Amino acid sequence: MSRAVIIRLALIGLIVMVSGCSLAPPKGFPTADDVDLDRFMGNWYVIAHIPPSKTKNAYNEIERYTRGDDADTINVKFTYREGGFDGQQKTMRPWATVLDDPSNALWAMHFYYVLRLQYVISYVSPDYDTTIIARDKKDFVWIMARTPKLDDATYQSLVDRVKDIGYDTSELRKVPQQPLSERDDL
């Protein structure tokens, strides 16, 4: 067997092994108590994040959730502009599976049919206007809202929640968001 084949097989094995790991957060990790999935559906503007490297220079980031064909599947459309408001629009279409029926706060986000990542709704406001999506590895976090801009007090309260989860909030990046009237990507 050639070295390239061995490396490919090892990578496939690693992906399968990682995607099969438990996605449940450890006991005590903050999760929203009872997420009403129908109310959670719709557009969420990413206000701030500790992003994956792919979106570290994103503008106008939006996650759109819609219910899938079965009760536990969520269709996701993630869009952003690369490098500026006039940058190339990028779109990703992962899907999510709801893993915990009682709270609906733990999802597995599926990418490319082989990769599953933990997605924890750690907080959603009572009016479903703001949310925090976290991971117990504390590698990524998203502060999102139903509008592209938050007032300073609301934003700071969400940053404080992120800090309480255990994240280094100095790593948060505010995502530039244009007013809705200036956008052509909705």
Roles of regions detected by a PLM:
Residues 1-10:
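Bacterial N-terminal signal peptides that target proteins for export
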Residues 21-186:
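A beta-rich soluble binding module of mature secreted/lumenal proteins
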Residues 1, 18-21:
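Intrinsically disordered, low-complexity segments enriched in Ser/Pro/Gly/Ala and basic residues
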